[in-house]
Structure formats: structure tokens, C-alpha cells
């Protein structure tokens, strides 16, 4: 639960209706999940409970995110912008679904036309920091919706021994690339190794975010030694 320090609320600039936009961001991989509105009441409720509450403009009442779907948002931190009129909520998304459509993020509709930079760099039209999380979502989708001739599906079908054998092979190739100090090969072999590790995680029903959470906790413990 977040500490009940509410002094910062006085610095916020709510609009004429007493509302302020709040953007929810995954606290582990930085993915933008959704945007909704808050007022002082919903913000105070969020701080007290540690679970995000918004203000529903259509229903004109508090909206406890996840109260019907079970996809609660656990508050991890709050920032607000230089004008103090937009908030960024760092949250843990329960169930990995923020959108009412069932998508992880509400921001899944992409505009790709008439944007020169996208045409020149179409491979990198999204944050690279999200790539591993997105890759794991693809692996999960392949598991739920098998596709013909899918390498991922063949690994999952063949099972643990095949997956672990591939991890051993890719690990050895990564070591050899490092010994040769071949930067391109190191990058390629590291990518192969990460992919096969993620397949193993999925096979054993371990979420990628569980790994990220372990890393985050280790980083926090090292930066805040007892």
C-alpha cells in the first residue's frame, strides 16, 4: 500500500470540472496501458487503498479499476508533468489486461501512413525496451492459438527436453561468439538464447514479468542496502 502522503495533490492543476488526466504505465517494462480521468476523491482513494481508482465521466462516480473484471491496478508510483496538469501512474496490472477489449493496452491502433520516419525505420516504430515483453506475448499467443509451421509451436509440442536442448545449444553458441569477440554474432546469439529461455518460461507457466520483478527487486535492494 502506498504511503498516505497527499501534500502533492495541492500542486496539481485540475480542470474546470475538477478532473485531471491520468496515464497508466506498466511499472516493469514501461508500456503505456491506458488513460483515464481522476478527481481529488479518486486520487485520495487510490493513495489510501493502494489500488487505482478513476473517475467515470459517463457514470459520474468513482471507478475502481478491475472491480468487475478482476484486472486491478496496483499503484507503484506517481509522477506529474511540468505543468502539473497530467499524471503518470506507475502500476502493476493484474491479469496483464488493461483494456476493456481484452488487449493488454488500450493503445493498440497504430497510424503508419504518411509518416516518413516510419517508412525509413519500419522495424523500430515502437520502443525497443518493450520488445522482450511483446515477444513473450507472441509466444503465449502461439501457445493458445497454434499456427501451422510455427517454430514456437513445434518447440512447445516437443516439450521440455527439446526446449532445454536448444537452450544448451544457444548458450554454447553465445559463449563461443563472446570468445570470438564478434559483436554481431554476440547480439544474434543473445537474441536466440533469450527467445528459447522465454519458450521454456512459457512451457513451465512462468510469466516474463515474474523474471522482470525479480530483477527489479534485486536492483532495488542493491540501491537501498540495509
UniProtKB/Swiss-Prot annotation:
<protein>
    <recommendedName>
        <fullName>Histidine biosynthesis bifunctional protein HisIE</fullName>
        <ecNumber>3.5.4.19</ecNumber>
        <ecNumber>3.6.1.31</ecNumber>
    </recommendedName>
</protein>
<dbReference type="GO" id="GO:0004635">
    <property type="term" value="F:phosphoribosyl-AMP cyclohydrolase activity"/>
</dbReference>
<keyword id="KW-0378">Hydrolase</keyword>
<keyword id="KW-0368">Histidine biosynthesis</keyword>
<keyword id="KW-0028">Amino-acid biosynthesis</keyword>
<dbReference type="InterPro" id="IPR021130">
    <property type="entry name" value="PRib-ATP_PPHydrolase-like"/>
</dbReference>
<dbReference type="GO" id="GO:0005524">
    <property type="term" value="F:ATP binding"/>
</dbReference>
<dbReference type="InterPro" id="IPR023019">
    <property type="entry name" value="His_synth_HisIE"/>
</dbReference>
<keyword id="KW-0067">ATP-binding</keyword>
<dbReference type="InterPro" id="IPR002496">
    <property type="entry name" value="PRib_AMP_CycHydrolase_dom"/>
</dbReference>
<dbReference type="GO" id="GO:0004636">
    <property type="term" value="F:phosphoribosyl-ATP diphosphatase activity"/>
</dbReference>
<dbReference type="InterPro" id="IPR038019">
    <property type="entry name" value="PRib_AMP_CycHydrolase_sf"/>
</dbReference>
<dbReference type="InterPro" id="IPR026660">
    <property type="entry name" value="PRA-CH"/>
</dbReference>
<comment type="similarity">
    <text>In the N-terminal section; belongs to the PRA-CH family.</text>
</comment>
<comment type="pathway">
    <text>Amino-acid biosynthesis; L-histidine biosynthesis; L-histidine from 5-phospho-alpha-D-ribose 1-diphosphate: step 2/9.</text>
</comment>
<keyword id="KW-0963">Cytoplasm</keyword>
<dbReference type="Pfam" id="PF01502">
    <property type="entry name" value="PRA-CH"/>
</dbReference>
<comment type="similarity">
    <text>In the C-terminal section; belongs to the PRA-PH family.</text>
</comment>
<feature type="region of interest" description="Phosphoribosyl-AMP cyclohydrolase">
    <location>
        <begin position="1"/>
        <end position="131"/>
    </location>
</feature>
<dbReference type="GO" id="GO:0000105">
    <property type="term" value="P:L-histidine biosynthetic process"/>
</dbReference>
<comment type="pathway">
    <text>Amino-acid biosynthesis; L-histidine biosynthesis; L-histidine from 5-phospho-alpha-D-ribose 1-diphosphate: step 3/9.</text>
</comment>
<dbReference type="GO" id="GO:0005737">
    <property type="term" value="C:cytoplasm"/>
</dbReference>
<keyword id="KW-0511">Multifunctional enzyme</keyword>
<dbReference type="InterPro" id="IPR008179">
    <property type="entry name" value="HisE"/>
</dbReference>
<keyword id="KW-0547">Nucleotide-binding</keyword>
<dbReference type="Pfam" id="PF01503">
    <property type="entry name" value="PRA-PH"/>
</dbReference>
<feature type="region of interest" description="Phosphoribosyl-ATP pyrophosphohydrolase">
    <location>
        <begin position="132"/>
        <end position="226"/>
    </location>
</feature>
